[in-house]
């Protein structure tokens, strides 16, 4: 009787929990699908616009978020 209870518990509780897709996984998948739909010109435009928005580092402290500007 105990073995039957364990088998029922596994199939009725644990197996459905293991096969459920988590809601947290779905936005990441949608984001990846949306990125794949971009053509190469759109990707290039996004990258170039991001590179143009860099600013000079204050007080000469250069790091990856800004460019070292002399003058």
Swiss-Prot record:
GO terms for cellular component: extracellular region. The modification Glutamic acid 1-amide is found at residue 70. Residues 1-24 form the signal peptide. Contains 3 disulfide bonds. InterPro entries: Conotoxin. It comes from the Eukaryota. It is found in: Secreted. Disulfide bonds join 56-68, 57-66, 62-69. Keywords: Amidation, Disulfide bond, Secreted, Signal, Toxin. Expressed by the venom duct. Is mostly present the middle of the duct (part 3, 85%) and just after (part 4, 11%). Pfam families: Conotoxin (PF02950). Residues 25-54 form a propeptide. GO terms for molecular function: ion channel inhibitor activity; toxin activity. Its main location: secreted. Belongs to the conotoxin M superfamily. The cysteine framework is III (CC-C-C-CC). Classified in the M-1 branch, since 1 residue stands between the fourth and the fifth cysteine residues. This is TxMLKM-021. It comes from Conus textile (Cloth-of-gold cone).
């Amino acid at each position: 009787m105990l073995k039957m209870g364990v088998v029922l518990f596994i199939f009725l509780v644990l197996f459905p929990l293991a096969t459920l897709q988590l809601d947290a996984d779905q936005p990441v998948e949608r984001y990846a699908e949306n990125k794949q739909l971009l053509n190469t010109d759109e990707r290039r435009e996004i990258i170039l616009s991001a590179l143009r928005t860099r600013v000079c580092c204050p007080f000469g402290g250069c790091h990856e978020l800004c460019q070292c500007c002399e003058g």
